[in-house]
Design a protein with these regions (language model features):
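OB-fold ssDNA-binding interfaces and closely related basic DNA-contact patches used
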Residues: 1-97
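Acidic, gly/ser/pro-rich intrinsically disordered tails
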Residues: 1-4, 160-197
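Beta-strand elements of well-folded, non-transmembrane domains
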Residues: 33-35, 135-137, 157
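Signature of extracytoplasmic/envelope-associated structural regions
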Residues: 89-99, 116-119, 162, 169, ...
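Short, basic/aromatic beta-hairpin or loop at an interaction surface
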Residues: 94-111
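Exposed beta-sheet edge/beta-hairpin loop segments within beta-rich domains
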Residues: 109-129, 136-146
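OB-fold/S1-family single-stranded nucleic acid-binding modules
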Residues: 140-160
């Protein structure tokens, strides 16, 4: 098996790491890396594909690369944002060469390294995470690709599931002028109003 490695910190999206996706029976997570790290990670993935191709196609026709484990993010109007999300997955189970079905699931840890086993725990979009994974390049019928196989997730900064705090998800951008929310100031204003009654 390929060596397990880790990503740098990134923002999590569409994480299903405690309970598998019902339709495909896989655990999944996408992460958005800083733009400075995106090209570096893409190059690392491409090098793994190139190694696999060179190893198995010497003197033969090069296969077409059909699968990269990332997708380009689009805004609400369908325009590319320049951001890339990398996709990691793990099958809920697999069958060994001996015909034995093996169940598996990713390990999930908090920032302090404590294992999280609560099946109701959810990672909301925008949470800051690191992902442990290994690359699985493949060749099949003249085509090549690579999958990023999920092993574990460390949650550094949790955004609670169901609370989408990423304005870009709704097509909003930061405005230079206008309202800026200050929780302490709002709390003081509410206290003042309450005292008046």
């Amino acid at each position: 098996m390929a060596a397990t490695t880790r990503t740098v910190k990134g923002q999590a999206y569409w994480a299903k790491v405690m309970v598998p996706d019902k339709e495909y029976q896989t655990f999944n997570i996408e992460i958005l890396l800083d733009k400075s790290k995106q090209e570096e990670f893409k190059a690392l993935i491409q090098s793994e594909i190139d190694k696999k191709v060179e190893m198995h196609t010497e003197g033969k026709k090069k296969p077409k690369v059909e699968h990269f484990p990332w997708r380009i993010v689009e805004d609400a109007e369908g325009m590319e944002t320049g951001e890339i999300r990398f996709k990691f997955n793990m099958k809920k189970s697999f069958v060994t060469r001996d015909g034995e079905t093996v169940e598996q699931h990713p390990q999930v840890f908090d920032a302090k390294g404590n294992l999280i086993t609560d099946k109701s725990f959810r990672i909301g979009n925008g949470s800051v995470v690191k992902v442990a994974y290994f690359m699985a390049p493949y060749l099949n019928k003249g085509k090549a690709g690579v999958s990023l196989r999920l092993k574990a997730v460390q949650v550094i900064d949790l955004v609670h599931y169901g609370v989408n705090s990423d304005p870009k998800a709704f097509g909003f951008e930061e405005e230079e002028e206008g309202f800026s929310y200050d929780k302490e100031q709002m709390d003081r204003a509410l206290e003042s109003e309450t005292e008046d009654f």
